């Protein structure tokens, strides 16, 4: 048996991070210029299209936002329902749901971009909610800006203090 939580394993962290980046690239480039993970981008594009009176286009950005909110909600519900389980960890359920949803998205034709993007945003939200830390250090497996900020901060603190522990973070 592993001595640490499987959610802290490096291969899983790498896989989740790559999957998060690929989901955004796929949804934006292949599914109608909508982000699966970068909800800030969707908020900006939603606001821009509302300001320009492009109501139909704006809806394409609102739906993934609502799906993201729903994904966080469902992940929290799964966590609460499974907190007493000794057989399966709630994060495993989240991963299984995510795999199923993303597999199904791959089967959707281009004419179904709106539900495909909603499912990807829902899936992303579940991942972001389930995998918040790696070795006790906060990280986001689907977004890079927070991780870039944290890495830069740790690098600067290490250079100032010389504290070897900061190099590990």
Language model: regions and residue ranges:
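Interfacial helix-start motif at the membrane-water boundary
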Residues: 48-65
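C-terminal ends and interior cores of transmembrane alpha-helices
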Residues: 99-113
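Pair of pore-lining "gating" transmembrane helices in MFS-fold secondary transporters
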Residues: 8-37, 41
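Substrate-agnostic recognition of the 12-TM MFS/MFS-like secondary transporter fold
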Residues: 41-47, 53, 120-169
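Cytoplasmic-side transmembrane-helix entry/capping segments in multi-pass membrane proteins
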Residues: 87-96, 116-119, 140-143
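Hydrophobic/small/kink-forming positions within alpha-helical transmembrane segments
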Residues: 65, 69-73
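Short, small-residue-biased leader/transition segments that mark boundaries at the very start
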Residues: 1-6
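Helix-to-loop junctions at the C-terminal end of transmembrane segments
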Residues: 72-87
């Amino acid at each position: 048996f592993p001595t640490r939580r499987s959610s802290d394993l490096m291969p899983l962290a790498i896989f989740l991070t790559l999957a998060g980046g690929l989901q955004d690239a796929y949804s934006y480039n292949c599914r109608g210029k909508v982000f699966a993970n970068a909800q800030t981008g969707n908020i900006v594009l939603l606001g821009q299209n509302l300001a320009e009176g492009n109501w139909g286009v704006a809806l394409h950005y609102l739906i993934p936002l609502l799906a993201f909110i729903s994904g966080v909600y469902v992940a929290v519900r799964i966590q609460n329902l499974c907190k007493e389980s000794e057989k399966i960890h709630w994060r495993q359920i989240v991963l299984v749901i995510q795999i199923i949803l993303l597999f199904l998205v791959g089967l959707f034709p281009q004419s179904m971009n709106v539900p495909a993007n909603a499912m990807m945003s829902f899936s992303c939200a579940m991942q972001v909610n389930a995998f918040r830390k790696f070795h006790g250090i906060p990280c986001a497996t689907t977004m890079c800006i927070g991780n870039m900020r944290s890495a830069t901060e740790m690098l600067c603190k290490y250079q100032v203090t010389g504290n070897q522990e900061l190099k590990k973070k």
